[in-house]
């Protein structure tokens, strides 16, 4: 049996209309959708894409909003183990994440762990919030020779 593939899918800043066509295609085709849960049942990313994943098997991925690196690493390790077990069954897994998976995303830690174990994984970009805000304000983030610097809050 062939191994499945993991997709880290950016679902944008919150508006379902900003989910890319590629993200929608990957989500509709995935066997399992991995859903980050920050606690208290908060699954914002799932609410954004619910129309694309209706009836899909969901894998709840506890990702508490804490600064304890050892606790977080343990969570990411367990999530990676669960995902790899699904990949070993030949199933495809789409891990949804707000914005873009390469910009301050919880997903990237799981991505690295899965890749380190020899599995195939692909990043599916999404609209990052800072781009959505600029569009909402009808303004440019930078032009010509200007530089753009993104600094965490």
Regions found by a protein language model. Give the residues of each.
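Class I S-adenosyl-L-methionine
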Residues: 1-16, 21-24, 28-120
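Class I SAM-dependent methyltransferase SAM-binding "motif I" and its flanking Rossmann-like core
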Residues: 102-153
């Amino acid at each position: 049996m062939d191994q499945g593939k993991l997709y880290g899918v950016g679902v944008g800043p919150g508006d379902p209309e900003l989910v890319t066509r590629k993200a929608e295609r990957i989500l509709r085709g995935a066997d399992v959708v991995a859903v980050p849960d920050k606690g208290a049942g908060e699954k914002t990313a799932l609410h954004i894409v619910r129309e694309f994943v209706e009836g899909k098997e969901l894998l709840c991925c506890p990702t508490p909003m804490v600064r304890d690196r050892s606790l977080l690493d343990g969570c990411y390790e367990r999530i990676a183990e669960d995902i790899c077990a699904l990949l070993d069954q030949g199933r495809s897994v789409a891990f949804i994440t707000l914005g873009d998976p390469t910009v301050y995303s919880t997903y990237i830690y799981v991505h690295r762990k899965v890749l380190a174990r020899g599995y195939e994984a692909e990043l599916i970009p999404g609209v990052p919030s800072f781009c959505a805000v600029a569009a909402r304000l009808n303004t440019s983030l930078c032009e010509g020779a200007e530089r753009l610097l993104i600094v965490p809050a």
